């Protein structure tokens, strides 16, 4: 009996130790991010007016969920840091409203959200429908557009591939990637499959429902696993589509001016690189060692 109790106690200790290790690992991933968020020095309790931001948290490292957290704090990523910074500069209480990517645009168009901040690129169609902010730069990996696929199919997607006949290529509905597939791959025989949620699309890729998925390179890095890999196929991307923008309602010209001022201030302060690197670590795209951060979330300089 004592032997059984000893074994049971040992098992409990092992499970407890594993849980503690997992918790510590999760906390270590967020150190640089938490430091960047704290540096913004934003206290929502100071403000009365609310800034509602539509966001689609399925696009790591730009925006994604940390399931260990609750409420608005569970939504993390580069665009969350940016939204927090903008809210502070505007003197407003930030409210994140999570929804699908295309619903973000509908929310702004209908006036149900003040801003849509969710890795949006400039497109001619969006310029007709919304007021569009100045660019913000979320790392070079967000300007490159790529196909991800499975290990078994990787050899099919070479950098100079010209025949996509019979291949199903996924993209998020309403995204720049949808536009690129329509313009560059459908004429070469590809069949476009649209998804509301990029994580659902990644599952469809892993299970063989589609042959490849069009994503921003940085997002592709976050989706890589034992099954999914980055392919060698890159889209040709016009300069006008590079970098990101914030979408506003056509009637909000005064708000646009304030948002652009906040973006200019963030750019001048050199915040974007720091934010993006912190989010790469958080999303496990890169390690702290790879990017040169210590255990306290500080950038190591020589």
Regions from the language model: what does each represent?
Residues 57-60, 72-88, 120, 142-198, ...:
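Bilobed "Venus flytrap"/periplasmic-binding protein-like clamshell domains
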Residues 57, 138-151, 217-263, 283-302:
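Periplasmic-binding protein-like
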Residues 84, 93-163:
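Acidic, polar ligand-binding/catalytic clefts
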Residues 31-120:
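Extracytoplasmic small-molecule ligand-binding "clamshell" domains
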Residues 26-32, 43, 174-193, 233-234, ...:
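Ligand-binding clefts/hinges and TM-proximal coupling segments of bilobed small-molecule sensing domains
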Residues 103, 119-129, 182-184, 204-207, ...:
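A ligand-binding cleft/hinge motif common to bilobed small-molecule-binding domains
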Residues 25-31, 80-89, 151-155, 167-168, ...:
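Extended ligand-binding regions for polar small-molecule ligands
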Residues 78, 95-107, 156, 192-207, ...:
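Short helix-initiation/N-cap motifs at beta->coil->alpha
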């Amino acid at each position: 009996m004592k032997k059984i109790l000893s074994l049971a106690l040992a098992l409990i200790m092992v499970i407890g130790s594993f849980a503690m290790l997992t918790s510590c690992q999760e906390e270590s991933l967020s150190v640089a991010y938490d430091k960047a968020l704290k540096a913004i020095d934003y206290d929502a309790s100071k403000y009365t007016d609310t800034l509602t931001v539509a966001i689609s948290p399925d696009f790591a490292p730009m925006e994604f969920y940390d399931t260990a957290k609750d409420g608005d704090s569970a939504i993390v990523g580069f665009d969350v840091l940016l939204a927090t910074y903008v809210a502070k500069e505007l003197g407003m209480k930030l409210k994140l409203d999570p929804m699908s990517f295309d619903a973000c645009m509908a929310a702004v168009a209908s006036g149900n959200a003040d801003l849509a901040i969710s890795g949006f690129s400039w497109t001619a169609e969006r310029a007709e429908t919304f007021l569009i902010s100045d660019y913000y730069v979320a790392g070079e990996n967000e300007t490159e557009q790529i196909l991800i696929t499975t290990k078994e199919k990787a050899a099919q997607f070479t950098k100079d591939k010209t025949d996509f006949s019979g291949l199903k290529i996924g993209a998020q509905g309403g995204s720049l990637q949808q536009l690129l597939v329509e313009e560059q791959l459908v004429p070469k025989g590809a069949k476009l499959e649209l998804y509301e949620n990029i994580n659902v699309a990644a599952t469809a890729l892993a299970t063989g429902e589609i042959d490849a998925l069009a994503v921003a390179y940085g997002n592709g890095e976050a989706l890589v696993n034992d099954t999914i890999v980055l392919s060698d196929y890159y889209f040709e991307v016009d300069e006008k589509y590079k970098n990101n923008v914030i979408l506003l309602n056509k009637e909000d010209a005064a708000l646009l001016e304030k948002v652009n001022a906040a973006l200019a201030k963030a750019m001048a302060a050199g915040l974007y690189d720091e934010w993006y690197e912190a989010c790469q670590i958080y999303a496990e795209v890169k390690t702290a060692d790879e990017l040169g951060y210590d255990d306290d979330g500080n950038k190591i300089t020589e």
